[in-house]
Amino acid sequence: MNAWKEFQEANKDRFLQELLDLLRIPSVSAKSEHNDDMQACAKAVAKSLTDAGAQIATIYETEGHPIVYGEIIVDPSFPTVLVYGHYDVQPADPLELWHSGPFEPTIIDGKIFARGACDDKGQFYMHVKALEMMTKTNSMCTNIKFVIEGEEEIGSPNLATFVKANKDLLKADVILISDTAMISMDNPSIDIGVRGLSYIEIEVTGPNRDLHSGVYGGAVANPITILSKMIAACHDENNHITIPGFYDDVIESTASERAKMAEAPFDLNEFKQDLGIANIWGEKGYSTNERTGIRPTLEVNGIWGGYTGEGAKTVLPSKAFAKISCRLVPNQSSTVITEKVLNYFKSIAPDNVTVSAFEHHGGEPYITPIDSHEYQSAAKAIATTFGKEPIPVRGGGSIPICSLFEQELGLKIVFMGFGLDSDNLHSPNEKYDIVNFYKGIETIPYFHQFFAEKK
C-alpha cells in the first residue's frame, strides 16, 4: 500500500464527515434568499483548500456568487493541473418528494442522500482530499490549481469575465473535471465528451387578462392549448425534431464509433425498471445510449399557466409559459440553435396569440481526443484502481464552461467523474455512494502521477 493510500485509510471517516458538513450548506445559486449561504459555502471551500495544503486560497467576488481560487506550486518545472468544480447546487424542489432533508445529509445503505452529494460537492471535494493526501505524504508531482465556482447551475454567467481577466493566474497544462458519471463501478468509464446546451423560455399571450372560462371559453384561444400544440409540433412521428435547420451542422457518427458504443454494458430492462417506465422513447434509428450521448435533443423542462393552486378555479388564462432545453452535439452552435428555436415558435404561432421568447443560457459541446496523453493518464489511473480499462463514452449532460476554457486557456479537458446515472442529479433524493467518493480520492493522485510521467 502506498503512502497516500495509507493516509486515506487512516482519515477516511474524517473525509466523509467534512463532506457532510459541506452538504449542510444550502448553496442554491438560483434563489436570492440563499445569497448568504453562497458566501458561507465559498468560505468553507476556501478553508478546506487551505487545510488540505494549498498555499493560496482566495475568494473572488463577482457580480453574482463568488469564485474560489486555490493553488499549490511545488516546483515551476512540474506540469500544472487546473481542477474545476462548482459548489452551487440545484434547487431542492419539490421538497415533499425527498425521503430526508435535502440539506440534512443522510447515509442509507452506504449512500449519501443530499442535494449536491454528487453534483458537484461530493465530486470536487474528492480533489481537495486527494490534495491533502499528497501534501501530507510528500507525494506531490504536479502543481495544482483550483477554480471552484458558485454559478454553474445557472449557466456560469460571470466565469468568462474571471477567466479572461486572469489568464496568467490560470496557466496550466490540463484541466481536470469531476462532474460526470461512470457506467457502473463494475464497468468504469470516462466521458470523452459532453453535449452543448441551449436553454430557452417561451411565453404565449392570449387575452389581456385571465377570463371566466364559462363566459369566454370556446370563443377565445386558450394560451395553454396553443402552447401545448406548438410544443407537440416540435417532434414528428419518428420523434425527429422538426425545427428547420436543427440538424444542419450535425456530423453523423461513423459506423465504427456506433459499434464501439454498442459494446458498452447496457441493460434495457434494468433501465426501464429503474425509471418506472413501461417502454422507452426517442429518435427512430438510434439506440438509447446513442440518443443520450451522440444525438441532439429538445426537451420541455417546465410548462405552466392559469390556475395551479389548491382546489378549482375556472379561468381561461391570459398567458402560458414553457422552458425548453436543447442538448447539442459537436459542430452544433448554441447560438445558432437558440435562434432557430426562437424563430420556429414565433413562425408557427396562430394570429390569436402573441409569442415572445428569450434565451436563458447556453454552452458548446466538447470532445476529448482519446489518443491524447491527457486522456491516457486518466485511463491509466482508473485502470490502476479499478483493475480494468475504462470504457470511453459520450456524456449526455452539458458543462458549458468547457469551450470557454479551451478557447481562452488553450487547454484540453479530462473528465474523471465517479457518479452514476442513477444518482438522481437535479431530482429529489440526490445521492452519492460512499464507495465512489473514496474510490475517486484514491484514483486522483494516480492521474497526477501518470500525467507528470508523460509530460
Segment roles from a protein language model:
Residues 217-239:
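A short core secondary-structure module
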Residues 184-185, 242-319, 330-343, 348, ...:
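An extended, acidic, His-containing surface patch that forms the Zn2+-binding/catalytic region
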Residues 120-193, 455:
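Acidic/histidine-rich catalytic neighborhood of metal-dependent amide-processing enzymes
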Residues 189-205, 414:
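Flexible glycine/proline-rich, aromatic-decorated loop/lid segments
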Residues 78-145, 439:
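Active-site metal-coordination/substrate-binding segment of hydrolases
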Residues 87-89, 147-155, 178-182, 206-208, ...:
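Acidic, glycine-rich active-site loops and adjacent beta-strand->loop/helix elements
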Residues 1-95, 319, 336:
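N-terminal helical capping/dimerization or prosegment-like subdomains
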